[in-house]
Amino acid sequence: MQLVLAAKYIGAGISTIGLLGAGIGIAIVFAALINGVSRNPSLRETLFPMAILGFALSEATGLFCLMISFLLIYAV
């Protein structure tokens, strides 16, 4: 029983590695937004909604990884 519990915790820990990718993706999105707005401030209204969409898509992958880790801990 202890071996199964340890395997669940190890699997949940490994599945949270995807959160690292989400964090890097969000950083890249907003770095590109800052770079674009600093080059041409008049495009702020055009670039900001695209940045929010990129943020949402990057964050969704992180939330899926977090959901899998919770499923491994509590449901399996």
Swiss-Prot record:
The chain crosses the membrane at residues 14-34, 52-72. Pfam families: ATP-synt_C. CDD domains: ATP-synt_Fo_c_ATP5G3. One of its GO terms (molecular function) is lipid binding. PROSITE patterns: ATPASE_C. It is a multi-pass membrane protein. One of its GO terms (biological process) is proton motive force-driven ATP synthesis. InterPro entries: ATP_synth_F0_csu, ATP_synth_F0_csu_DDCD_BS, ATP_synth_F0_csu_sf, ATPase_proteolipid_c-like_dom, F/V-ATP_Csub_sf. The record marks 59 as: Reversibly protonated during proton transport. It comes from the Eukaryota. GO terms for cellular component: mitochondrial membrane; proton-transporting ATP synthase complex; proton-transporting two-sector ATPase complex, proton-transporting domain. Keywords: CF(0), Hydrogen ion transport, Ion transport, Lipid-binding, Membrane, Mitochondrion, Transmembrane, Transmembrane helix, Transport. It is found in: Mitochondrion membrane. F-type ATPases have 2 components, CF(1) - the catalytic core - and CF(0) - the membrane proton channel. CF(1) has five subunits: alpha(3), beta(3), gamma(1), delta(1), epsilon(1). CF(0) has three main subunits: a, b and c. Belongs to the ATPase C chain family. Mitochondrial membrane ATP synthase (F(1)F(0) ATP synthase or Complex V) produces ATP from ADP in the presence of a proton gradient across the membrane which is generated by electron transport complexes of the respiratory chain. F-type ATPases consist of two structural domains, F(1) - containing the extramembraneous catalytic core and F(0) - containing the membrane proton channel, linked together by a central stalk and a peripheral stalk. During catalysis, ATP synthesis in the catalytic domain of F(1) is coupled via a rotary mechanism of the central stalk subunits to proton translocation. HAMAP family: ATP_synth_c_bact. This is ATP synthase subunit 9, mitochondrial. It comes from Vanderwaltozyma polyspora (strain ATCC 22028 / DSM 70294 / BCRC 21397 / CBS 2163 / NBRC 10782 / NRRL Y-8283 / UCD 57-17).
